[in-house]
Every structure is written in C-alpha cells, then in structure tokens.
C-alpha cells in the first residue's frame, strides 16, 4: 500500500472515531469513557492509537488514546473520571496509525446550551481552519496558511495562541515543517504535492 493511501486510511479511521466520540459526548459521561470508545473504534479498524505511549519526553509516555480538555484547559488534557456536564466546552484530540502512517485530528464541541460568546469562539476557530486550508495549495508558501488563520481570527476579535502550532505528519506523529498560526504570507517552505500537514488552531 502506498504512503498516500496509508495516510488517507489513517485519516478515515480517525474520522470514524471522531464521529463516534462526538455522538457519545453527553452530560454524565466521563472523559475516560470517551477514551475507551475512541480506542475501541481505532483498534476495530486494525489501526493503532497514535497518542497512547507517545513520548514527548523519554520519561513521560502519554497514558491515553485521546487528549480530552474541559473548558479553560487549552489542550492535552488526560482522560479520567471527571463527568461531562451541561454547558461544558470540551476538546478532543487523537490520532491513529495505519501501516506505519499517522492520521491526526481534533474537535471542540459545546455540551447542550452554551453561551453565545463560547459558540462564536468555536465557530470562528472552525472557520479559521478552513481559511488556512484554502491556502494549502501547491506552489504556495507555508506562511500563507499561517497568515490566513491569523487574519481571520483577529478580524473576528479573537487571538491565536502562538505557543501551539501545526506540523507535518507521516511516519512520525510530529514532523517538519511546523505550521504556526500567525505570520506574514509568502514565507517558509514551498508547498509541494504529496505533503501532509496537520493544522492545529487554538484561539482565545
């Protein structure tokens, strides 16, 4: 199986797990239950969770299949027994490996009724992603993506969190190039056919 097909398949598995978890996020459920569900879907497709056992540092392997963050937690929360409540805003991030190639995705949802401002933040962040994707074209420059994300977010009176960036993805979960969510257009590596990028946006 070619590398492009493997990455597509890993993305398909991630999308299936994403849909299952999103549907299961309800008041009373725990983030640990969401973690177990994601792992079940991933493994039932013959894939391996990307995050479980991943070592950002040699001494600290990540213990779960998903990152699950509540409300003010920006990213990389570890699932546990905390129950999801009405009005929570939760973010889920995870990946899957197929034939040695990674897929990676994240989403944020409101649980039941949330404030108008919270929903607007979710909507603006989502649209910022699509603005960045529009600039991910062969012959463009990496920071064309960065600039589009920043311009849309700031035009809607939000800010990008600069400490967290997107990245290349393939045989490793995190590969070069890093993809910041800010900057001037027309800079950085030339975008070429076959590149795989994971855009990672956090707005406040």
Where in this protein do the model-derived segments appear?
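Translation machinery proteins
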Residues: 41-75
